[in-house]
Amino acid sequence: MGAHRFMGWLLVVAFAGLLFAHPGLYSRTGLYALLVGAIGLSWLLLLVRRRQWVEFALPRELAWPVAVVLLSAGLSLLVNVDADWRALWLLGSQLLFLWVGWWLARCSSTVRLLGGAIVIGGAVAGLYAWCQFLRLDPLPTSTPFGELRIVSFFANPNHLGNFLACAMPLALAGWLEAVADRPYAGRSARFQPIVLYILIGLIYGGGLLSASRGAWVAGLVGCLIVGGGHLWEVGRGRTKLHLLPLLGLFSLLVGITALLSQRPVVRDPQKAVSMSERILSSRHIVQPYSTLDSSLTAAPGDSILVHDNAINHRYFIWQVTLDMIRSHPFAGLGYGSYQKRFARFRDAKQEEEHFKTLNWVAQSEATPYAHNEYLHIWAESGILGLLGFLALVATILRQIVLGIGKRPRQALYLWGALGVVAVMLIHSLVSYPLHLPLNGSIFWVLSGIIFGWDSGNDKLSL
C-alpha cells in the first residue's frame, strides 16, 4: 500500500470513528484527540522517511494565509497574560488536516475513497435518523434532547444537519456525473446512478428530520450551486442534460418532503412542531422578537415579544460577542478563551431588556461558541485572525473557480466541492461547524484537496 493510500484509509477510519461516536457509546471529542495524535504521528514519520521536503511544501498561495492565521493566534495569546496556550492544539489539528488533504489530492483514487466515504457516511447517518424518527433506535437516548429531536449519531441536531448538508452536494455531483457517464460505463458502473439515487434519498430525508433551519438553508444553497453548475456545464457543451433521471430525482425529493411535511420533527413537551411549521418558523432568523410599547407593559422584560427562543438566544450571544470584540478589536481576547471570557460580558447585560427575555438556562450558560464562526474568530484572535481566515477562504474559492475553467472533466466535482464550502460558510453565520470534530475535519481536508488537485487527475468520481 502506497503512502497516499495509507493516509487516505487512515482518514476514512478517523471519519468513521467520529461519525459513529454515539453519545451513549464513547466521546467524540476524546476520540478526536486520539485520532489527531495518530494522524500527526503518521504524518511526521512520513516526512522523516521520505525526506523530500519540496513534496510537502505548501504553495505560496496557501502558505501565506495559514501563516497569518497562526501569527494572529499566537499574538492573541501573547498579549493576554492569562491565556491558555494549550488551546492551540485545535488550530494545529485543523491546519494538519488542511496540509494532509493538500498532499493527498495528488492521488485520484484516494480522493475517490474520501468522497465516497463522506457520501456513504451521510447515508448511514440519514438511515439512523429515520430509525430514530420511527422509534426503532436500539440505543437509549443519551443527549439533553431526549426524544424531542432527531440527532442520529450526534449530540445535537444542528451537528447532524450540517454533516448531511455537506454530504448532499457531493452526492448530487457524483450522481450527475454517473448519469452522464452511464451510456459509456461498464456493466457494474451502470448501477452507480441507482445506488447514489438511494443514498441521496437517505441523506435528504435525514437532513429534513434534523430540523436544523440553518443547515436547511445552507444545504439548499449548496445544492443550488451544484444544480446551477450542472446547467452551466450543459450550456458550455461539456455535458448533456438528462431530463428523465433528473425528473426521477426531483420526484424522489418532493415525495420525501411531502411525506414529512405534516410529521412532527420537534416533539416539544407543549406542542409537536411539524416540518412545514418548522420551515415557516425560519422567518424568525431575521426577526426573533418584536419591541412593544413599554408604557403598555406591566413588568420589566415584557416590552419585548419573543417569537423564537432559540434564535433570540443567538442574537443575545452575538450582542455579547460584539461587546467582546469592542473591548479588544485588534489582538482579541486570546485564542481558545471565548468560553472563559463570555460570562463577564454576559453578566454586564443583566439589566438590559433583552437579557430578561431569556430563560434561566440561557441567562446562566457560559456558551463555548459564538454561534457565528466569523465573530468567534474576531473575538479570540482579533481583526488579523479574521482577515487571515477570510483570505484563506477567498483563496479556496479562487482555486475552485480556476479549476472549473481549466479542468472540464473534473468540473462537476469542483461544483460539488464549492457546494460543500458554501454549506460550511453559510451555516457558520448561525452555528459553529468548524469547531466540530467530524464536520470541521471534512471541511479542512476538502479545502486541502481543492488546493492540491493535480491537473493530471482528469477523471475523478465518487
Feature names for model-found ranges:
Residues W9-F15, V195-G201, P368, N372, ...:
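Loop-to-helix entry and N-terminal half of a specific, functionally important transmembrane alpha helix
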Residues L70-L77, T110-T141, A155, H159-G161, ...:
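Hydrophobic alpha-helical transmembrane segments
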Residues M1-R86, L95-I120, T141, A173-Y197, ...:
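Transmembrane signal-anchor hairpin modules in multi-pass inner-membrane enzymes, especially those
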Residues A16-Y26, Y374-S381, Y413-F451:
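Membrane helix-loop boundary segments at the extracytoplasmic
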Residues H22-Y32, D82-R86, A129, A155-N158, ...:
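Helix-loop-helix junctions and helix-breaking kinks within/between transmembrane helices
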Residues G229, I383-W415:
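Hydrophobic transmembrane alpha-helices and their immediate junctions
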Residues D137-F154, R267-V320, M324, Y335-A379:
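Interfacial juxtamembrane loops and adjacent helix segments
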Residues G30-L46, L88-L98, L160-M168, V217-L224, ...:
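Membrane-embedded alpha-helical segments of multi-pass membrane proteins
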